[in-house]
Amino acid sequence: PQTRCAIELGGQDAKMIFFRTNDKGDIEVADMRMNGSCAGGTGAFIDEMAKLMGVGTESGEFEQLASRGTTVHEVSGRCGVYAKTDIQPLLNEGIPTTDLALSALHAVARQTIGGLAQGIDIEPPVIFEGGTLAYNPTLVRVFREQLNLSDDQVIVPRDPQIMVARGAALSLTDMFASSQ
């Protein structure tokens, strides 16, 4: 209930929901933003970057690489095609895949923050939801760093990949209970 912003990353989409306290003291949705038709900055983007590096995502291999990265290189998060043109020369130069995986996650966070917040302050606490964040804890760390959040300003629920489904079920339960 104390959440002020929800960041949800799935395989094909990215969402940011901003909450505020209304005059009655209740939490309500102030604004909601979702990415357009491009999958840049989503799980599909991470899948493409992993494929380019010759590693898997479902096995956790990409996450393991990113967690060991130490240097962030400039990679476009806006478009997978642009990102490939950034990463391929870095691969050819011999940049470690650990750093490239970390760089791709930084690109995802930049794209989400810049593309969805668009002038709205991201106030803590921030909850992180969706499968992309569930399976990439390093991505949550990157968001935390880019947003200058302390550990107590970050909420990662148990099973973040099903938070939306859980919320819908609770909402429907309340709706049907109040109509009887």
State each model region's role.
Residues 1-10, 15-20, 25, 113-118, ...:
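Conserved phosphate-binding catalytic cores of ATP/NTP-utilizing and phosphoryl-transfer enzymes
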Residues 15-22, 31-32, 46, 74-77, ...:
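Short acidic, glycine/serine/threonine-rich loops at helix termini
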Residues 83-114, 161:
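Adenine-nucleotide phosphate-binding core of ATP-dependent small-molecule kinases
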